Amino acid sequence: MGERLLESKKDHQHGEILTQVPDDMLKKKTPRVKSCGEVSVGHASLNRHHRADTGHKPYEYQEYGQKPYKCTYCKKAFSDLPYFRTHEWAHTGGKPYDCEECGKSFISRSSIRRHRIMHSGDGPYKCNFCGKALMCLSLYLIHKRTHTGEKPYECKQCGKAFSHSGSLRIHERTHTGEKPYECSECGKAFHSSTCLHAHKITHTGEKPYECKQCGKAFVSFNSVRYHERTHTGEKPYECKQCGKAFRSASHLRTHGRTHTGEKPYECKQCGKAFGCASSVKIHERTHTGEKPCSSNTSKGQGEKIA
């Protein structure tokens, strides 16, 4: 009762009210910027972060209670752009943030951040193959499929199968041509948020993921995780047919084709088919006359592709 909830300053010349959250209100508890999920300790960092997140300027002229962002579906109005976007996605079913681990999609950055904790490797469900621990049973079952090769989700268009529904959903966009993730720098569009994120780094040159062993930096979490296995010698993906082990699920899949005879990569020039993408690229040079850079092909380097 009688508590000062909002500090307001009247601009008599323009007849508008300038608002700012008061210091004593922010000190009551650890503040949270809900538009992006980032937590800030202290009112100063919260104010700075909120302005960076929303684009608002300190003491910006704005009519008190103004809500310029109106939902086209239910006409609900919002004063904050991130809240407005998240609300509209609730109507459209849009979930623009994809988890790289399991393919599950989320409506906001804060939601996917919370979800990623589930993949942290600290949980009660331990994988018998590689020892990784998962937070919940559903994630454990999805993870286990990377070892067993089980792919229960099949594309109705081409019959290609996937280990989880999120991957199938992204794959189906290759048939529909849907590319909902657009780069703000160059306008290039992508099938998934993961591809967009990897592309954006080509503009910035940023490599945020660093190897704890040698300090080498990478553009994606999956890349640094694969690289770290070169230090540990870990090869958690084992072929059921011959027992050969690999550092990544993709290498196991490629190897598996030597047993099944599957050759999904076809030369555009002559139609010859291959078991892996690198083999078809090498073959295509016989048509183009292109020669690989000699500096990358010194004696004793490289690996023969079977």
UniProtKB/Swiss-Prot annotation:
MF GO annotations: DNA-binding transcription factor activity, RNA polymerase II-specific; RNA polymerase II transcription regulatory region sequence-specific DNA binding; zinc ion binding
Keyword DNA-binding assigned: yes
Pfam families: zf-C2H2, zf-C2H2_6
Superkingdom field: Eukaryota
Zn finger residue spans: C2H2-type: 31-53, 69-91, 97-119, 125-147, 153-175, 181-203, 209-231, 237-259, 265-287
Phosphotyrosine modification, residue list: 209
Cell compartments where the protein resides: Nucleus
Similarity section: Belongs to the krueppel C2H2-type zinc-finger protein family.
Role: May be involved in transcriptional regulation.
Identification of the protein by name: Zinc finger protein 625
Organism for this UniProt entry: Homo sapiens (Human)
Taxonomic lineage from the root: Eukaryota, Metazoa, Chordata, Craniata, Vertebrata
